[in-house]
Amino acid sequence: MALLLLGLTAASVAIAFQRGQTQRCLDFYGTEAATAISRAPHVELWQLTEVDGLPTATRRVDISEAKGLVHLRRGLVEDANFDWEAAPAAGPTLPAGAWDWLMVFADSSAAAESDGLRLVLDLGDEGQGGWISVVGQGGRVG
């Protein structure tokens, strides 16, 4: 009985610790988006270029089987990887040309075309941090 109680206690501590490491990301992305980042079977990376004032995909790469994707997924949902103090609460919208990459998390290649979670990435200028934002949601984080 003591061993079972010890196991339940350890599991509870682990869950609380894990939640503490990801709480701000969950608040920023939302639970559904964070789940898509962590578990979507199909992931694409699109290179963006500004065309007629709009960000346009000029190159698409399927990274679903890429080495290190599991680490990237994890990094995208860990609070420590972002500068939460730099995030503008209601700052100005970045211009279309500021966004360098788009990541699509979807159920399939066909779904990536129109569905799925979309994250836009601004890699920033040299010596400056970048930004990440969820397409269709307000706010961004550095």
Regions found by a protein language model. Give the residues of each.
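Function-determining sites in protein domains
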Residues: 1-142
